[in-house]
Swiss-Prot record:
Entry-linked Gene3D superfamilies: 1.10.287.1480
Keyword Ribosomal protein part of the UniProt annotation: yes
Complex formation: Part of the 30S ribosomal subunit. Contacts proteins S3 and S10.
Keywords, alphabetical: Ribonucleoprotein, Ribosomal protein, RNA-binding, rRNA-binding
Cited SUPFAM superfamilies: Glucocorticoid receptor-like (DNA-binding domain)
Protein name, per record: Small ribosomal subunit protein uS14
PANTHER family the UniProt entry points to: 30S RIBOSOMAL PROTEIN S14, SMALL RIBOSOMAL SUBUNIT PROTEIN US14M
GO cellular component: cytoplasm; small ribosomal subunit
Family designation: Belongs to the universal ribosomal protein uS14 family.
Biological function: Binds 16S rRNA, required for the assembly of 30S particles and may also be responsible for determining the conformation of the 16S rRNA at the A site.
An individual GO BP term: translation
Length: 101
């Protein structure tokens, strides 16, 4: 089980990403628009840099929803590999069966 502080930190990051997503998209559109003047693009870049660091989606880390484990997490299920296997063996994930060939 990951420390509760790490899980809370990730939740805080997810909230910040949602909060600033629109603002970041607007500023990035201005920066990428070559029809704008250099000054406008530069100001947009400064405003983007002034936003909180944790509002960038690349700062997020996928964690297991049950344990908070940061590595070996399956995006589709939101679970770590260990908990995914346990849930699959108990039949809690519809349509998932153990592979055999």
């Amino acid at each position: 089980m990951a420390k509760l502080a790490l899980i809370n930190r990730e939740q805080k990051r997810a909230d910040l990403v949602k909060k600033y997503a629109g603002k970041r998209a607007e500023l990035k559109a201005i920066i990428d628009d070559h029809s704008k003047s250099e000054e406008e693009r530069y100001e947009a870049r400064l405003k983007l840099q002034a936003l909180p660091r944790n509002s960038a989606p690349t700062r997020q880390r996928n964690r297991c929803a049950l344990t908070g484990r940061p590595r070996g997490t399956f995006r589709k299920f939101g679970l770590g590999r260990i908990k995914l296997r346990e849930c699959a063996m108990r039949g809690e994930i519809p349509g998932m069966t153990k592979a055999s060939w």
